[in-house]
Amino acid sequence: MYTTGNHTINDSFGTAFMIGSFDVRYYGILYATGILVAIIAGILTLKYKYKVDDNPYFYYVFIGIISIIFGARTWSFIIGDSIVGVTPFFAIHQGGLAIQGGVIFTITTGLIFFFFILRKPKYYVKKNYLVYENHNLVTKTFYKQASMWIYADAIIPTILIGQAIGRWGNFFNHEVYGQGLTAEQALNQWGFLKVLMPGVFEHMFINENGVTLFRVPIFLIESFFNVIAFIIIVFLLDFVKELKTGGRTMLYFFTTGIIRLIIETQRDSQFKFVTSIVTSVLFLLGGSIGFIFTQWIFPRFRNKKNYFFLFNKVKIYFIGLFKNYLNKYKNLTKEEIRKKLEPSSTIYSKNFSEMFFYADDYDLMIKKD
């Protein structure tokens, strides 16, 4: 039981319905709904905005759902929100899902999954070009591996809308709230909420240690700004023609870092975790640095002999140095090793994202229409 400003409310407030003795809570429903909406948004973005094969994402969804739930639950124990030996690990319907852990685990598994699956030729993208061949203008179709940046830009920002929906589960569980205000202070500072969302306003009067105060609805603030960030990154940035691939991904980390840093520092003391604050700072810094690299540093490497040039020079040097210990190369001269390992010059005309994610597939598959 807990008490609001005017009356007492039973814990059943957070229960949507019962299945036998098992209570299905709004927290679990809203968290699942957030994941589903994010998945649908990612599929639509891949299919209609970027026009790349969405099948890899369909396959990843099964891994991603497990990753986000497992990661969020594990992170809850890491930051101290849940306690080992006290809190059941699989009682996720009762709360204790830390979204930062879900994001970290899901992106990590996504990097591994997409790195391998996008190397399959059936997922290559194709473009038709008019080229001169034997003094004739012919159409050729060029096939190449889709950059992981494309999938990242399409999928990762959709986490914001999932977070926005999932945060409402914290409202029904009476979690993620800020400092306490008296009824008079609440009306002065949050009177608009009583007009726009009277139910939310009423249920933010929470009794703690025998004292009933209005708790600042941090969940609502985060949900609101996540929706704004989602709209800006996914839709409004379409009008910024200078935005380069990878920018949306980094802006996700930047914006979610700012939002979470503000939210984490304003939480009630029982919901404030140092690890979450540090993680928010890392998201913010990582997004800022990553945005600079994707927009200004990486493009400067395009059409230049940099990444693979340096990599192969170092590789050739060390193989030549230790060739006597390598059966495959010990009978070759250093010049023969160089010719064998140095890639064709065509690799140097590829842009950075292609070089970075193409590994050893230097040559494009080409066929005539």
Swiss-Prot record:
Residues annotated to bind a 1,2-diacyl-sn-glycero-3-phospho-(1'-sn-glycerol): 167
Main location as per UniProt: membrane
GO molecular function (one): phosphatidylglycerol-prolipoprotein diacylglyceryl transferase activity
EC number from the UniProt entry: 2.5.1.145
GO process annotations (BP): lipoprotein biosynthetic process
Cellular localization per UniProt: Cell membrane
Enzyme class, broadest EC rank: transferase
Keyword Membrane among UniProt keywords: yes
UniProt cross-references to InterPro entries, sorted A to Z: Lgt (IPR001640)
Pathway: Protein modification; lipoprotein biosynthesis (diacylglyceryl transfer)
Record's keyword terms, sorted: Cell membrane, Membrane, Transferase, Transmembrane, Transmembrane helix
Source species, domain of life: Bacteria
Keyword Cell membrane: yes
Membrane association type: Multi-pass membrane protein
Protein task: Catalyzes the transfer of the diacylglyceryl group from phosphatidylglycerol to the sulfhydryl group of the N-terminal cysteine of a prolipoprotein, the first step in the formation of mature lipoproteins.
Similarity field: Belongs to the Lgt family.
Protein name per the record: Phosphatidylglycerol--prolipoprotein diacylglyceryl transferase
